[in-house]
Amino acid sequence: MGDIFSARVAGNIENTDIIGSMEFSCKVAGAKLIAVIGHTNCGAVKGACDHVEMGNLTALLSKIQPAVYDEKTELQSRNSNNPVFVEKVAVINVKRMVHAIVERSPI
């Protein structure tokens, strides 16, 4: 199977450091697969759904906010009290981050 090179961040957001780590793992360490993994009941996604503002977390959550706005099927209870809404936002967020990684990385 091989080794796992892991770069973790709340809300599985992308940034220059995370993308740089992915590029290192592929180009230098020889990784052949990158997985962006969201999870149920993600606190960062819930924070974005609730429009939380708290210190440096605010900037991180702002990267998840587009997924909140992109989710159009849940018209009521668009907050963390609605587990269906949170799950849909989490899925959209993963897809958005995969797209951003592909767009931003030349490797």
Describe every region a protein language model picked out.
Residues 4-6:
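Conserved beta-strand scaffold positions in the cores of enzyme catalytic domains, especially
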Residues 2, 11-32, 43-107:
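Divalent-metal-activated hydrolytic enzyme cores
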